Swiss-Prot record:
<protein>
    <recommendedName>
        <fullName>Ribonuclease 3</fullName>
        <ecNumber>3.1.26.3</ecNumber>
    </recommendedName>
</protein>
<dbReference type="GO" id="GO:0008033">
    <property type="term" value="P:tRNA processing"/>
</dbReference>
<dbReference type="GO" id="GO:0010468">
    <property type="term" value="P:regulation of gene expression"/>
</dbReference>
<keyword id="KW-0819">tRNA processing</keyword>
<dbReference type="GO" id="GO:0019843">
    <property type="term" value="F:rRNA binding"/>
</dbReference>
<dbReference type="GO" id="GO:0006364">
    <property type="term" value="P:rRNA processing"/>
</dbReference>
<feature type="binding site">
    <location>
        <position position="120"/>
    </location>
    <ligand>
        <name>Mg(2+)</name>
    </ligand>
</feature>
<dbReference type="GO" id="GO:0005737">
    <property type="term" value="C:cytoplasm"/>
</dbReference>
<keyword id="KW-0540">Nuclease</keyword>
<dbReference type="InterPro" id="IPR036389">
    <property type="entry name" value="RNase_III_sf"/>
</dbReference>
<dbReference type="GO" id="GO:0046872">
    <property type="term" value="F:metal ion binding"/>
</dbReference>
<comment type="function">
    <text>Digests double-stranded RNA. Involved in the processing of primary rRNA transcript to yield the immediate precursors to the large and small rRNAs (23S and 16S). Processes some mRNAs, and tRNAs when they are encoded in the rRNA operon. Processes pre-crRNA and tracrRNA of type II CRISPR loci if present in the organism.</text>
</comment>
<feature type="active site">
    <location>
        <position position="51"/>
    </location>
</feature>
<comment type="subunit">
    <text>Homodimer.</text>
</comment>
<feature type="active site">
    <location>
        <position position="123"/>
    </location>
</feature>
<comment type="similarity">
    <text>Belongs to the ribonuclease III family.</text>
</comment>
<keyword id="KW-0479">Metal-binding</keyword>
Length: 232
């Protein structure tokens, strides 16, 4: 575990004093590792904590960077910065996938490149840094990667779901209706199929590793469909 700590510390510029918390942050649920109380040890609890820490630090960073913006604009920026794809891309940047501890089946099925695994493990790593090193160290880590992303946003982004809702309101149509079509895959690596329906434009579906992302993808597909139909 010391060698793992040494290797990852060179990338994230933080060295853990508690090796066990680092190992927990990098352990995929597929390992089925148990502690002395026969409880499964994986990154899921730390992921829960890391998600909250990331949201807090990103919110504070945006508050400082954009002093003139209203809450709504800041919220749009934050939503984009803490979404699954953004977190997974940061995980790719630091090559976190190569450090995730998983069973052979998960690894052979592309687990090290799975976007949901990358998202979850990075959130867990953030939670672990917070526990091991406190707020100052975790802020340093998050700001190192997220501040440049925040500064790169010239304007608050408009997510597809919001754009689709505004389009229906503008055209005096009922609001979009989202429906979970099906959920497949194991509990630790699910895939959700979500459909969205717009009156006069039918229904489209999209799949993703989370309901939120699937809804955004479905909304994006519906906007494309509306654009094509409108141009006919």
């Amino acid at each position: 575990m010391k060698s793992l700590n040494d290797a990852i510390s060179k990338i994230i510029d933080y060295k853990f004093t508690n090796y066990a918390i680092l190992e927990e942050a990098l352990t995929h649920p597929s390992v089925n590792k148990r502690n002395s109380k026969n409880q499964i040890v994986s990154y899921e609890r730390l992921e829960f904590l890391g998600d909250s820490v990331l949201n807090m630090v990103v919110s504070a960073t945006l508050f400082k960077l954009f002093p003139e913006e209203k809450e709504g604009a800041l919220a749009k920026r934050k939503t984009d910065l803490v979404c699954g794809n953004t977190i997974a891309n940061v995980a790719k940047e630091i090559k976190l996938g190569s450090f995730i501890i998983m069973n052979n089946s998960e690894r052979c099925n592309g687990g090290r490149c799975n976007l949901k695994n990358l998202e979850n493990s990075l959130e867990a790593l953030i939670g672990a840094i917070y526990i091991d090193g406190g707020l100052e160290n975790v802020e340093k880590f998050i700001i190192q990667y997220w501040e440049k992303l925040a500064k790169g946003m010239l304007d608050p982004p408009q997510d597809p779901k919001t754009s689709l809702q505004e389009w229906t309101q503008k055209n005096k149509l009922p609001l979009p209706e989202y429906e979970l079509v099906k959920q497949t895959g194991p509990a630790h690596n699910p895939e959700f199929t979500i459909s969205v329906c717009i009156e006069d434009y039918g229904k489209v579906s999209a799949c993703a590793s989370s309901k939120k992302i699937a809804e955004q993808k479905a909304a994006e597909l519906m906007l494309e469909k509306i654009g094509k139909d409108a141009s006919v």
